[in-house]
Amino acid sequence: MQAGQTTPSDAAEVGGPERDLARLIDSYLTTQLLYVAARLGVADALADGPRTGREIATSVGADPDVLTRVLRGLVLDDVLAEEDDGRFALTALGERLRDGVPGSLRGAALARGELYWSAAAGLLQAVTEGGTAFEHVHGEPFFARLAADPEREAAFQASMADRAQREAADVVAAYGFPGIGDLVDVGGGSGVLLDAILRATPELRGVLVDRPEAVERARARLGAAGLDGRSECVEGDFFATVPPGADAYLLSRVIHDWDDADARRILTTCRAAMPAGARLLLVEAIVPERAHDGPEAVRMDLHMLILLGARERTEAQFRDLLAGAGFDLRRVVPTGSAAGLSVLEATVTSAAR
């Protein structure tokens, strides 16, 4: 290092803007510390109370000295607490790294620390040359990579299910799904949102359409909830066809996975299946005009850019996208969710019938 140069750690000692920027630069540590903790099951090892680093290491199969250093890093981010006797304990943040607890983010930590992490290295190339960051790094599309790697596919799906679980109640409470007898959940994943809708609206029947592996998980979830009599899970390709004749077609966090051309193809497929008077319901984050007015939507937009070359959209962009597929945007219902989701309700334009 040349004279006069400083490392981020040196800058952190200075204070002020240098310190704050140094913390941002060092944030790469946080992602990987959380990933290691999630991967090893550190939070679950602390579920019964505080333990020493050595005790945790024995429980999760790790090197005691190295793991203890990782645990201290997590203390700095308030994920763990370090007690006077040197034992470590879960904080409210750390509790959300446990597997299967309400509000769990373990799946997100696993996904961010693996595929998202590696794909981000391709962002500069995507910005300067075009294309998708993920494909620059891995040489194939994101979903193709997942399909070839069952372990990472499981981690990603766990992340999606955790997220859907956190958001479903807000969506149902905000929109209510009134006047709908039959609903098709297009790309409904593991069925978390359809489960919540069916529980809240006893008069409604639902059909979930997705890939075979998702359908299997959804069928198991809805069956365990006793909702199999009011639901059906079918394999399908939403670029080709969806079940016709329903009162409403729901696409939750689907359209943001695709660029405008592919998104329009999906919407056109739905339009072809919709009878007169049917509703199209999109559950999506709406990008605000100014970043600080919707930080979660802005962050998700960057995830979509890096992984898929796709995007979150402003309300005006949604309106244009829907119009291009033969829909009128009728209303936007904010859900109040932490992710800033809204339900966009649209109907087929008279000219498109």
Each model region followed by its residue ranges:
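Conserved Class I S-adenosyl-L-methionine-dependent methyltransferase catalytic core
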Residues: 11, 18-39, 44-50, 58-59, ...
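Alpha-helical subdomain
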Residues: 2-82, 177-178, 182-353
